[in-house]
Amino acid sequence: MMKLYDFLPCPFGQKVRIVLAEKSLTYELIQIDLAQGDQRRPEFLRLNPFARVPVLVDEDTTVYDSTVIIEYLEDEYPEPPVLPSVESSALRARARIFEDFADTSFTPQVGQLMAEMARAEGERDQGRLQRLHRSIERALDYLNHELTGQQFLAGDFSIADIGFAPRLLVLGELGLEAGLNRPNVDAWIKRMLERPSIQSLQGVTAEALAGV
């Protein structure tokens, strides 16, 4: 059986868990408590010398980095797919571009907002909060535009959508309504929330907010 080493509030681990659920793959979840420094233990560093989760161990294969793990799962367990068909290289590129956008220009910003909001109200940097709000709002406006006439970002449900899901689910608790005045984003989120793989993340929202 596969093993997934993960910290439940981690959005990158959540990406992998969505894919595992979509593919109905069974695995053993081994929780790595980042707050307790489990990621720096020698036995974990042997799996990932960069001391980061998630890490997937599938028999004799060890893979780290959420994007690489998902690509491995897609190659090894192709059905059902989470990437567009190989016959559509343009759509596959679009899906990967949006996953990268989520990883670099959305998830980190929401994480920084979570960290700032975790401070006592009088200690929050209001200027930083405003900058983070603007950055996230711009990303949501862009997504609203890119979803025009589409149910998902790259054809069918794919890694393009999966990359955004973990942090989209916490925005409401941070005072941001992703779908407000963004009908395409609003409908997109509702479609994703119909999927059991996404519904399973809702239970860890509180953990994510508490674990910053």
What spans do the regions from the language model cover?
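Phosphate-coordinating loops and pocket residues in cytosolic domains that bind phosphorylated ligands
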Residues: R46, E194, G203
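GST-like fold's C-terminal all-alpha helical module
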Residues: A90, A102-P196
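Residue-level recognition of oxygen-bearing side chains
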Residues: V68, N184, S197, G203
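Conserved beta-strand edge residues that scaffold enzyme active sites
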Residues: L34-A35, V185, A206
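Terminal-tail/helix-coil boundary detector
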Residues: L201-V212
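GST-like domain detector, emphasizing the conserved glutathione-binding G-site
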Residues: M1-Q130, N144
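Short secondary-structure boundary/hinge segments and terminal tails
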Residues: G37-D38, E74, I189, L209-G211
